[in-house]
Amino acid sequence: MSADVKVTLVRSHIGKASSVKAVLVGMGLTKRQKSVTLKDTPEVRGMINKVRHLLKVEE
């Protein structure tokens, strides 16, 4: 059974690599201060690790 992870975008993707923006869009984070709840899977954890400097993660 997978737990959920709440992810909030706290920094903008402007000026970052296009791959960073692609990861954020894939997670459903398009604007600052937007939060989404995702399943805690290895794939999602990998996406979070790639852009962890822009996010706030709550277990």
Curated annotation (Swiss-Prot):
One of its GO terms (cellular component) is cytosolic large ribosomal subunit. Pfam families: Ribosomal_L30. Coiled coil: none annotated. Keywords: Ribonucleoprotein, Ribosomal protein. InterPro entries: Ribo_uL30_ferredoxin-like_sf, Ribosomal_uL30_bac-type, Ribosomal_uL30_ferredoxin-like. Part of the 50S ribosomal subunit. This is Large ribosomal subunit protein uL30. It comes from Geotalea uraniireducens (strain Rf4).
